[in-house]
Amino acid sequence: MLHAKIVDIKEKKISLSDAEKFISSNSYGASIFFTGTVRNQNNNKNVVGITYDSHDALVIKSFQEIYNEAEKKLNIDVKSVFIEHAKGYLNLGEISIVIAVACKHRDKTYLLSRYIIEEIKKRSPIWKKEHYLNNKTSWLKGNPIINEKN
């Protein structure tokens, strides 16, 4: 079971209670919540906020592909996964992503949660523009949408 969504923060904030409700079930003995938040330092620069942009349809597709791949690669057939990523400007400490995972056992839950966040960072077309204390901004280097072959 998968919930995958891009959240426009002008309309709604990411909700941990929504994640908890989605993954709650008597079928699962373990659950994990991963939250990514805006931190105040990156590459020795004082960050005050981040603007996230994304290609929403491709992001959702990548979330679904990652979920489906995980089932095969990690051999986890009974699971519930909730993924939401913010789009728009976030202040320090605000949640940019939540990944909630529930499985029968804790080992698979940890494994699946880690797999999902690492694959999202590698593959999902989500871009970050950092806003600094000195009023400057910078788009961070991301990954290409299409894998280039040499």
What would you call each of these model-derived segments?
Residues 1-95, 102-114, 118-150:
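N-terminal, polar/charged subdomain of small-to-medium soluble alpha/beta proteins
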